[in-house]
């Protein structure tokens, strides 16, 4: 008896523990991801997201324009907000992003796939770096996250909330783009309730 090799546990018993461990790791990951996305703008890489794709495409086309980037300039801000609000069907208040170093250039009306119409507000900093805010009516559930067009292209921080689909797009470092998006989001929500 003492000279014999120890008996091995049945294969099903060792596989059960492996399966239980894998399930536990999966649950921790899912729960952690859920909790992280509840109250902040998190990161999601979802190539099927139309809102982010449309916002990035519009930004790439119009942010590069010098003379024809907007239809209505910032000097007509009240008209711009009223016009875009009426056309998109949402109350739209252009966020003041001066604290983040960006001034409103103006805005334009764009087509937006299933949503119909979207507003695009264009902002610029002192160095000429441009970001855009893309806003459309959205009936989807609340989602917050980011979407990246390509490794070296513009990135969109987007959210769907209170009937609004919004994306802030730019080629800024991720932390700065998220800070701008949070400020824009807060001001849009404040504008909705005023």
Region spans (language model):
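Short phosphate-engaging motifs
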Residues: 80, 129, 176
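A short, solvent-exposed beta-edge/loop patch
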Residues: 140-194
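A short acidic-to-branched-hydrophobic micro-motif
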Residues: 117-138
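Juxtamembrane extracytoplasmic segments of single-/few-pass membrane proteins
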Residues: 15-20, 28-118
């Amino acid at each position: 008896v003492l000279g014999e090799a120890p008996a091995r546990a049945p294969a099903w018993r060792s596989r059960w523990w492996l399966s239980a461990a894998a399930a536990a790791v999966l649950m921790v990951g899912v729960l952690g991801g859920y909790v992280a996305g509840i109250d902040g703008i998190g990161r999601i890489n979802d190539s099927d997201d139309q809102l982010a794709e449309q916002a990035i495409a519009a930004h790439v086309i119009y942010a590069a324009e010098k003379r024809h980037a907007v239809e209505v300039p910032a000097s007509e801000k009240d008209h711009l907000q009223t016009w875009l609000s009426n056309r998109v069907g949402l109350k739209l208040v252009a966020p003041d992003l001066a604290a983040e170093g960006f001034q409103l250039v103006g805005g334009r009306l764009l087509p937006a796939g299933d949503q119909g119409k979207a507003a695009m507000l264009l902002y610029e900093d002192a160095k000429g770096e441009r970001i855009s805010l893309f806003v459309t009516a959205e009936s989807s559930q609340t989602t917050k996250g980011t979407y990246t067009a390509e490794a070296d292209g513009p990135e969109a921080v987007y959210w769907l909330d209170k009937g609004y689909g919004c994306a802030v797009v730019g080629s800024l470092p991720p932390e700065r783009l998220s800070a701008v998006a949070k400020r824009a989001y807060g001001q849009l929500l404040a504008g909705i309730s005023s």
